């Protein structure tokens, strides 16, 4: 089977994936500023925003789009890399910007604007705020000091699953089996009320992560029917979740009754857009501005919510709703730019190197010379396609109970430089 793209150099970037990530972040920004009930507006958004807000409400689905991108990028990052380097790259990428953004939000909600958490129904204590600096506050049921932070707990759990897969050894067959069985296993343990496994397996958003991983296999190895059918299966699982969750969530958080058709289309778009920018000639597009777009995505996601709402709260009566929204967007973009240049570019590399120095001796002793990642090439004679019956037992589908969702209260963050690997 011919590869999707010609062999590329390691330095060739997936520029359009960077752009898609920024668009996903901007869709979430638009949802928060122009559609969601918020302390910025002291309730529902003004009527002046309604013509736009009834559409930007679906920007909330930028979060599952982030998760599909996560599945793609994290598998690409982990393949061929050992566990210490993978963990160090994640720590260096996520934490510097997060610590600064979390510290800012702590000062804002505890000192400058306590009406913010009061409006959102959160009681945030000093100890809760400090636990937020770890990024694992969700594991302890502690409120996030910034509403956008909830997605990072999902990301961390996905990283853990990737590490477990790396320890077993990443091969094409194992990734196919993992992506097939993960959402089904999650649905089974959810139906049995197994709290620990349900938290680990994330039944609600697992199909989005798994779908992104499968799209990376298609990008890496080329088109084949079996993998495409598995992508379709993940999309169906994701649609089942979306139709059971987003109508009620959007009706509660916005003044408008959502359209089921729009939610279904948004769910399909999460997979379709990632496929479009990675499996077509668009994947070959690259430019400096695309790199900048990717670099700003994570810091923008981190800082926009509380900061933007605070700006809207201060300016809405003075310059009107649209003026306040425009200023809030500009301020959020400026803050994201500062966070990237002053924190990420100066600290991320140092933290990554320090983490790697700490992890490598322990990993070397535990590994005893055994590589953490299995060889990439398939065995001779192994077909490029995969039989669904080999990885998807019929009884699991029949008895999975998929659809009985108990969803966590609602919305990622990755390397700004996804690259096209050479010699797929």
Which residues does each PLM region occupy?
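Transmembrane alpha-helical segments and their boundary/interface "anchor" motifs
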Residues: 24, 60-64, 76-111, 131, ...
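Alpha-helical transmembrane segments in multi-pass integral membrane proteins
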Residues: 2-16, 30-55, 76-80, 84, ...
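Membrane-proximal cytoplasmic C-terminal regulatory module of class A 7TM GPCRs
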Residues: 346-379
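Hydrophobic alpha-helical transmembrane segments of polytopic
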Residues: 17-24, 28, 56, 63, ...
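Membrane-interface helix-loop-helix regions
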Residues: 36-61, 69, 94-160, 185-188, ...
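Small-polar-interrupted transmembrane alpha-helices in polytopic inner-membrane proteins
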Residues: 25-32, 175-191, 231-236
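Acidic/Ser-Thr/Pro-Gly-rich, low-complexity N-terminal segments
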Residues: 1, 367-424
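Hydrophobic alpha-helical segments with transmembrane-like composition
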Residues: 66, 73-80, 92-94, 131-192, ...
